[in-house]
């Protein structure tokens, strides 16, 4: 049985999500789907000029997973450019839903993806953790278990 795919952390969303070669009508063109996390991987590596380890850390994936994501992204972009295909940026397995938690036992403050991660302190393993609600994403999820 395969492990579930971890959400990739994404900080940037483009205003434009569809690119077509000049002079070709949309209705007569093949398109390639570039995942949101693939665009993020290229942005971190090629525009922000971070090294692989820094990119992987920002996206909260392993270095190998980051390399797989960016390899896939670059192949798609090069294929679209050389074969005159459109690029649609959509889909993927990503999140921006991060929330800061604080452990009541050891007072460690850390971020979690509340769609995926369990609310257990990564430092001491305690389940006595609370959302500080400052991120604003999880107001409905926390339901009063907050610290101010």
Curated annotation (Swiss-Prot):
This is UPF0251 protein Cbei_2962. Pfam families: DUF134 (PF02001). InterPro entries: RNA_pol_sigma_r3/r4-like, UPF0251. HAMAP family: UPF0251. Belongs to the UPF0251 family. It comes from the Bacteria. Disulfide bonds: none annotated.
